[in-house]
Each structure stands twice: as C-alpha cells, then as structure tokens.
C-alpha cells in the first residue's frame, strides 16, 4: 500500500521538478501492492530527487501520471521535459495524449503530427490520436486509427471508443457488432458506452433503461439526466460526452 505520507512526499518532489506545475493529487491507494503506474512514478520521482533535470525521468513520470489519470501532473512533467529538451518526439506524444484527455484536441493533433514528422510510428499513437480526431468531429479518421490500434494489440477501451464513434457516424449495425463481445463478457464500461451510443442514435428510452438498471446507481442517475440531449449535440460534443464525460451546458444546447 502506498501511504498518504508517501504520496505527500511525491507531491513535494513534483513541485520541485515541475516549476509551478499542478501538484500530484494526494490520495490513499487501497491496494495490497502498488500498481505498475504507481511503481513507475515512484521510481521516476526518486530519480528526479537526485537530478531534477533528468529528461528521461520526467518523461517516465509523465507517462506514469497518465496511467494514474493525473492529467495535470502529466502535463507538468511533459512541459518541464519540453523546456529541457525541445522537440523531443516522446514529449510531443506525451503532451498530445494528455491534451486529448483534457479535451484540448486541436493542440493534441498538432503535437501528434509533430511526433509523426519526427518518426514516431502511428501505431504508437493510434488509440489517443483517434480520440483526438473524434473530439473534433472527424469520426472517419478516428475509426481508421482505432482499427490500427486494435490490430496492434489495443484493448477494451479502444473497442468502446470505436463503437461509440460508429454510433456517432449513424452506423448502428457496426456499433452493435463492435460492442457485443464486451457486453457478453459483462464489461460494465461497455454498457455505459452502449447507453451513450443508443442515445446518440435517438433511442433515449432504452439508453436510460440501461443507465438505470445495469450501471451503478450513482453513475446511472447522473447519465440519465443527459441522455435525452445526446442527439442534439454536435459529433464532437457527443464524443466528448461519451469518452470524457464532458457535457455542454444545457442552456447552450
């Protein structure tokens, strides 16, 4: 188990290594052993304690923070690495992934393109680059990249992203077929994706039935309030809602 005290120490190191960047959130990790992301972050922070200008350690820390879903910290680490080593393609990919997940897709796509020009293969970026395209409403490019990612071993999250993108494109048959194996396996996030996809396709009642009966009570209730609005959103807004949980204000719909 990683204690709060240890995470607090990590936060201090982050503040030292990333000048002015948001600190890593302190939280109790209730697990018998630290996960891979936590171990990777702990190792990177130890190296930064010895040398705060260790670019590789900063990049490792940024990637670990992404694994732990601490996007602000990841941006801080990658930003500091970019100051020390401008134009590093690994930094471009890391920042692009973080910007995608913080709903900054235009900046992300620019950085993905920079990384590609620097020689980073699309297979290394396909999953998150696909999401960035979905977040600007380009579902065709997104789906091409999701399939590339799946051909190279990407997992269930990419399957769910592809299915939702197909629903956004209006292809219900493909949406259902893509999601079915995960639904058969009882994958709860797949049921969430199904609810969003059905709502996008105009079947809000079935979507709300799923939200209210299959998903955890709190999540289902929060989702149900938005499902009626999904067909009225732009493609980019639908992708942001279904993938990131980012909704426009109802007054602006």
Residue ranges: model-predicted function:
Residues 2-8, 12-72, 76:
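N-terminal leader/linker segments that initiate helical-solenoid repeat arrays
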Residues 46-47, 80-82, 114-116, 148-149, ...:
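Canonical positions in the second alpha-helix
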Residues 57, 91-92, 125-126, 158-159, ...:
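TPR alpha-solenoid repeat register
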Residues 60, 94-95, 128-129, 161-162, ...:
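Canonical tetratricopeptide repeat
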Residues 144, 151-159, 165-253:
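Extracytoplasmic and endomembrane cell-envelope/extracellular-matrix remodeling and assembly machinery
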């Amino acid at each position: 188990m990683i204690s709060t005290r240890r995470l607090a120490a990590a936060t201090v190191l982050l503040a030292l290594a990333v000048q002015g960047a948001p600190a890593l959130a302190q939280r109790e990790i209730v697990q018998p052993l630290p996960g891979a992301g936590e171990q990777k972050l702990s190792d990177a922070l130890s190296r930064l304690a010895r040398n705060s200008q260790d670019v590789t350690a900063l990049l490792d820390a940024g990637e670990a923070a992404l694994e732990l879903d601490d996007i602000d910290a990841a941006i801080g680490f990658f930003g500091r690495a970019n100051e020390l080593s401008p134009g590093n393609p690994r930094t471009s990919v890391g920042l692009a992934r973080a910007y995608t997940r913080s709903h900054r897709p235009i900046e992300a796509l620019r950085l993905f393109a920079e990384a590609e020009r620097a020689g980073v293969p699309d297979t290394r970026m396909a999953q998150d680059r696909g999401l960035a395209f979905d977040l600007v409403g380009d579902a065709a490019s997104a789906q091409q990249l999701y399939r590339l990612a799946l051909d190279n071993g990407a997992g269930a999250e990419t399957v769910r992203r592809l299915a939702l993108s197909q629903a956004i494109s209006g292809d219900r048959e493909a949406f259902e077929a893509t999601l079915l194996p995960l639904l058969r396996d009882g994958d709860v996030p797949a049921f969430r994706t199904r609810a969003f996809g059905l709502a996008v396709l105009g079947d809000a009642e079935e979507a709300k039935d799923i939200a209210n009966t299959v998903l955890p009570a709190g999540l289902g209730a929060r989702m149900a309030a938005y499902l009626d609005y999904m067909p009225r959103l732009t493609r980019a807004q639908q992708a942001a809602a279904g993938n990131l949980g980012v909704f426009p204000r109802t007054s602006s719909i």
